[in-house]
């Protein structure tokens, strides 16, 4: 595998916790899912500690920090509460995301261009505790350029519009937006990741884009795991990604 064909899989385990929280039980354990994902080939584990604590809890994050063999990618809103928690936990990676209580899932990218100083301050605080920061943004040149200006070393391009496209033409246009976003981000010296809405039937065109470092995928893997088991679900996704990246 060359640098050009290398691609990483970050497995988001939020929805293992969603199932647990639905009944207020101690199972299924997202930490167990994370360890299984690592054994199946995951390159990192992503968790989003939301303001309303609808799935992942602080205890999960603390336990993951202690036991992961790979690395944690801590998704968080840009709030004082979350920044203080991240400074305590010191995750290897942090991803700043927009957040609204009423949304089912993150609906769009962070408006970096509209709040550059606020994001710059957050990036500096996280970097000071050794956390590599990425910004979850739409594949919009204005947002990508702003991300570079505020000092973030990485971005994660929101692939939701590609994933939700209702016809092949729309999907092709959205995929091209992602391609152009990757190229612009790389030209500005950014590490470029991507994610949101990716599943077993749409991941390959994104994984085949030259310059993408990592894909973060959760819901599709957790759903598929109901039928094949968590390790198998992770292994199948990683295999699809590697096969697509090999064709770059």
UniProtKB/Swiss-Prot annotation:
The keyword Transferase applies. It comes from the Bacteria. SUPFAM superfamilies: Pyridoxine 5'-phosphate synthase. Pathway: Cofactor biosynthesis; pyridoxine 5'-phosphate biosynthesis; pyridoxine 5'-phosphate from D-erythrose 4-phosphate: step 5/5. Disulfide bonds: none annotated. It is found in: Cytoplasm. Signal peptide: none annotated. One of its GO terms (molecular function) is pyridoxine 5'-phosphate synthase activity. Its EC number is 2.6.99.2. 1-deoxy-D-xylulose 5-phosphate binds at residues 14-15, 50, 55, 105. One of its GO terms (cellular component) is cytosol. It catalyses: 3-amino-2-oxopropyl phosphate + 1-deoxy-D-xylulose 5-phosphate = pyridoxine 5'-phosphate + phosphate + 2 H2O + H(+). The active site is at 48 (proton acceptor), 75 (proton acceptor), 196 (proton donor). 3-amino-2-oxopropyl phosphate binds at residues 12, 23, 197, 218-219. GO terms for biological process: pyridoxine biosynthetic process. The record marks 156 as: Transition state stabilizer. It is an enzyme of class 2 (transferase). Homooctamer; tetramer of dimers. Belongs to the PNP synthase family. Catalyzes the complicated ring closure reaction between the two acyclic compounds 1-deoxy-D-xylulose-5-phosphate (DXP) and 3-amino-2-oxopropyl phosphate (1-amino-acetone-3-phosphate or AAP) to form pyridoxine 5'-phosphate (PNP) and inorganic phosphate. This is Pyridoxine 5'-phosphate synthase. It comes from Pseudomonas paraeruginosa (strain DSM 24068 / PA7). The lineage of its organism: Bacteria, Pseudomonadati, Pseudomonadota, Gammaproteobacteria, Pseudomonadales.
